[in-house]
C-alpha cells in the first residue's frame, strides 16, 4: 500500500527514483515508525502520514538544491537530510542534532539501509565548527528564520546558501531577518496530499 502511494507521490512531484531509492525511503518510514514507539522521535504516529509529512515534505526541496555539500541543522530523526541523501547520492549531508537518541537512530538507519553519503553529529549548532564549510545549510522546523541565521551564520561556504523550510510565512518573521542577510528566492512548495502552505526561502550572506 505504502509502495503504491510513494510511486504516485513521486510522479506527482516529477521526481524520478530507482527501485533501490524507493525501497530505502519505505524502509526509512518503517524504521522511523518502529523506533518512534520507544524513542518518541516524531509526533506523527502513522506510517501513511509519515510518508506525506516527513518524506514528501522533505523531497519537494530536492530539485532546488545547489552544490554538493550540505548540513541539516536540528535534523531530529534525519529530516529532511536522510530522504534528500537517498535521492541525491552525488551530494553529502551532515546531520546535526543535540539529542543523542536522534543521532543513534540516524546512524542505525545509515547502517541498515546502506546510506553512505550522510554523517551524523551530536552537537548544538552554535558549538559546531566544521573543518570545511557548506554549499547549503538546511533547516526544517528548527527555529525562526532570525534564530536560524543568527546561530548558523558560520556554516556556509563563501558562495553557500541557507535553505529555510517554512510553513506559512508571516510578515513579522520576514521583517526580523538580521542585517547582512538577503532572501534571494521564495518558492512555494506543493506537497502531495498536504493541504497546508509550504515555502522554501533561499538566503545568502551579503
From Swiss-Prot:
Subcellular location: Cytoplasm
Ion transport keyword on record: no
Keywords: Cytoplasm, Methyltransferase, rRNA processing, S-adenosyl-L-methionine, Transferase
GO cellular component: cytosol
Record Gene3D superfamilies: Vaccinia Virus protein VP39
UniProt catalytic activity: guanosine(527) in 16S rRNA + S-adenosyl-L-methionine = N(7)-methylguanosine(527) in 16S rRNA + S-adenosyl-L-homocysteine
Matches recorded under CDD domains: AdoMet_MTases
EC number: 2.1.1.170
Annotated positions binding S-adenosyl-L-methionine: 74, 79, 125-126, 140
Gene Ontology molecular function: rRNA (guanine-N7-)-methyltransferase activity
Record's keyword annotation contains Cytoplasm: yes
Domain of life: Bacteria
Family listed: Belongs to the methyltransferase superfamily. RNA methyltransferase RsmG family.
Function (record text): Specifically methylates the N7 position of guanine in position 527 of 16S rRNA.
Protein name: Ribosomal RNA small subunit methyltransferase G
Gene: rsmG
Amino acid at each position: 500500500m505504502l509502495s503504491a502511494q510513494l510511486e504516485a507521490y513521486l510522479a506527482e512531484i516529477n521526481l524520478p527514483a530507482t527501485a533501490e531509492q524507493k525501497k530505502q525511503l519505505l524502509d526509512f518510514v518503517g524504521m522511523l515508525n518502529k523506533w518512534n514507539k520507544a524513542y518518541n522521535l516524531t509526533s506523527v504516529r502513522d506510517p501513511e502520514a509519515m510518508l506525506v509529512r516527513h518524506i514528501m515534505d522533505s523531497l519537494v526541496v530536492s530539485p532546488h538544491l545547489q552544490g554538493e555539500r550540505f548540513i541539516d541543522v536540528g535534523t531530529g530523526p534525519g529530516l529532511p537530510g536522510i530522504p534528500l541523501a537517498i535521492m541525491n547520492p552525488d551530494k553529502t549531508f551532515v546531520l546535526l542534532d543535540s539529542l543523542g537518541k536522534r543521532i543513534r537512530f540516524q546512524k542505525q538507519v545509515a547502517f541498515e539501509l546502506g546510506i553512505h553519503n550522510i554523517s551524523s553529529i551530536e552537537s548544538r549548532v552554535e558549538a559546531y565548527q566544521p573543518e570545511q564549510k557548506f554549499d547549503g545549510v538546511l533547516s526544517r522546523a528548527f527555529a525562526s528564520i532570525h534564530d536560524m541565521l543568527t546561530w548558523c551564520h558560520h556554516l556556509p561556504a563563501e558562495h553557500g546558501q541557507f535553505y529555510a523550510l517554512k510553513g506559512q510565512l508571516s510578515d513579522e518573521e520576514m521583517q526580523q531577518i538580521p542585517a547582512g542577510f538577503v532572501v534571494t528566492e521564495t518558492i512555494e512548495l506543493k506537497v502531495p496530499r498536504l493541504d497546508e502552505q509550504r515555502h522554501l526561502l533561499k538566503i545568502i550572506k551579503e
